[in-house]
């Protein structure tokens, strides 16, 4: 399986994602520039964290206009897996691939710590290697991770089981403690915590490895989940 790791000006977690796929999961990955226009030959797309375009205007607001994003939208609409982490989540909401928005943290400052999450739905391409209701520890590092959407959208997220992860405590003001959501089809996931920083026990936790193992399990089995 081959993963595309996107790189925007200001991305700073792309190497961590590459390491998680190549060195830990022993799969193939390649960096793909924001100037590229094709994702041919890739099985999954990973959009890393960082500060794309220095978060100018709004986190992800300029990145959504990069040439590669046209290909990402087409890739997602074709039902292929797309994972956006931290700034990647922000980019996905700006691009309209996920509902809602990421607002400044309620505390109005950057938060960098390890938090506890609960797996709300394990019937997705990204969570099938976790038990439903399991708690996992993942790092966060963001200033704008406060998930918000209108009441109708929030009701739809719950009704469609699109909430993949929640924080077990109120970390940043996110509605219903939402930490990660999928699109309605289930092939796009955005999450603020960093699973790629928790794939080796040596570094404190391997709880994030399940996200990548879940993607691989689905790709290799050819079985899709969550409404596909």
Curated annotation (Swiss-Prot):
It is found in: Cytoplasm. Its EC number is 6.3.5.3, 3.5.1.2. Residues 3-225 form the Glutamine amidotransferase type-1 domain. GO terms for molecular function: ATP binding; glutaminase activity; phosphoribosylformylglycinamidine synthase activity. Pathway: Purine metabolism; IMP biosynthesis via de novo pathway; 5-amino-1-(5-phospho-D-ribosyl)imidazole from N(2)-formyl-N(1)-(5-phospho-D-ribosyl)glycinamide: step 1/2. It catalyses: N(2)-formyl-N(1)-(5-phospho-beta-D-ribosyl)glycinamide + L-glutamine + ATP + H2O = 2-formamido-N(1)-(5-O-phospho-beta-D-ribosyl)acetamidine + L-glutamate + ADP + phosphate + H(+); L-glutamine + H2O = L-glutamate + NH4(+). GO terms for biological process: 'de novo' IMP biosynthetic process. PROSITE patterns: GATASE_TYPE_1. Keywords: ATP-binding, Cytoplasm, Glutamine amidotransferase, Hydrolase, Ligase, Nucleotide-binding, Purine biosynthesis. Pfam families: GATase_5 (PF13507). GO terms for cellular component: cytoplasm. The active site is at residues 86, 194, 196. SUPFAM superfamilies: Class I glutamine amidotransferase-like (SSF52317). It comes from the Bacteria. Part of the FGAM synthase complex composed of 1 PurL, 1 PurQ and 2 PurS subunits. Part of the phosphoribosylformylglycinamidine synthase complex involved in the purines biosynthetic pathway. Catalyzes the ATP-dependent conversion of formylglycinamide ribonucleotide (FGAR) and glutamine to yield formylglycinamidine ribonucleotide (FGAM) and glutamate. The FGAM synthase complex is composed of three subunits. PurQ produces an ammonia molecule by converting glutamine to glutamate. PurL transfers the ammonia molecule to FGAR to form FGAM in an ATP-dependent manner. HAMAP family: PurQ. This is Phosphoribosylformylglycinamidine synthase subunit PurQ. It comes from Latilactobacillus sakei subsp. sakei (strain 23K) (Lactobacillus sakei subsp. sakei). The gene is purQ.
């Amino acid at each position: 399986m081959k993963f595309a790791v996107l790189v925007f000006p200001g991305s700073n977690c792309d190497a961590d994602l590459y390491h998680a796929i190549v060195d830990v999961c022993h799969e193939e990955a390649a960096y793909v520039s924001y100037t590229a226009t094709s994702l041919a030959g890739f099985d999954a797309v990973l959009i890393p964290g960082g500060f794309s375009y220095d978060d100018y205007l709004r986190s992800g607001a300029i990145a959504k206009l990069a040439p590669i994003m046209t290909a990402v939208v087409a890739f997602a609409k074709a039902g292929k897996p797309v994972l956006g982490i931290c700034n990647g989540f922000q980019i996905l909401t700006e691009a309209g691939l996920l509902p809602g928005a990421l607002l400044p943290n309620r505390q109005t400052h950057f938060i960098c710590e390890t938090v506890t999450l609960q797996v709300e739905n394990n019937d997705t391409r990204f969570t099938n290697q976790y038990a439903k209701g399991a708690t996992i520890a993942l790092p966060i590092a963001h200033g704008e991770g406060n998930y918000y959407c209108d009441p109708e959208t929030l009701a739809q997220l719950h009704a469609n089981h699109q909430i993949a992860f929640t924080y077990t405590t109120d970390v940043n003001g996110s509605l219903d403690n939402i930490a990660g959501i999928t699109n309605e089809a289930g092939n796009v996931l955005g999450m603020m915590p960093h699973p790629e920083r928790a794939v080796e026990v040596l570094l404190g936790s391997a709880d994030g490895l399940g996200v990548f193992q879940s993607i691989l399990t689905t790709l290799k089995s050819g079985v899709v989940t969550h409404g596909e």
